Amino acid sequence: MKKGFRIIKFKKNKPVFELKDISKSFDGRPILKKISMEMHPGEIVGLLGPNGSGKSTLYNIIIGQHTADKGKIIINNKDISEIPIHERAKLGLGYLSQQRSVFNMSVYNNLLGICQLTIKGADEQRRVTEKLLDEFNLQHLRTINSNVLSGGEVRRLMMARIMINKPKVILLDEPMAALDPIVVQDIQKYILKIQSYGCSILITDHQVRNLFDIVDRAYVLGEQSIIADGTPNEILKSSKAIQLYFGNQYTN
């Protein structure tokens, strides 16, 4: 799936999301060193790096599972570094876990239950639920228990639930992992749909091609720090990124 001739002018907009000099150590061992990055409104940014490079730690810091030793996390000009995890969604942060994170109930009730927690009025709750069922192609699954959904169907349900809170910044953790190529293309389509709502998306994936099909830019983590950043073409010209992470994927 290619974006075609989309013209990107994100730099003229003020960043909606920023990391400023994020550092983290565990038991005296540095995991992240002065990580800085930014996303602009409507931008899709990839986060790449080999296993153990600190991607999961960085995500956990952003969502509030871990606390950075130093640095700031800024969303919509607000420093959320000290804000509890359960409050961050209210400030415009959405997160899709790599794990199968759905309730043991129907697809419809998975969505309606979240709507009832965050939206006032039963009529509006049902309206939003129906809208999301339509937009994420879930209407035919509305009465099906989420535990029997396929991997791609679960990803669509999880993405639909994220949109209930109308986030400005969304973290997607391996949303295309362990999916067939045809299903990957389908998930890419829905990621671009989320972007069309004006959301900024930070996304990880072990398959570089999957990311480069949809991202505007990417950051590469290595040696506890950012070793490369830029458009996919710029990343592929980085000798450090090629040596550390890409191997033979793009040598031809």
Task: Give a label for each model feature.
Residues 145-149, 153:
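Conserved ABC ATPase signature
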Residues 63:
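Helix-to-loop junction immediately C-terminal to a conserved catalytic motif
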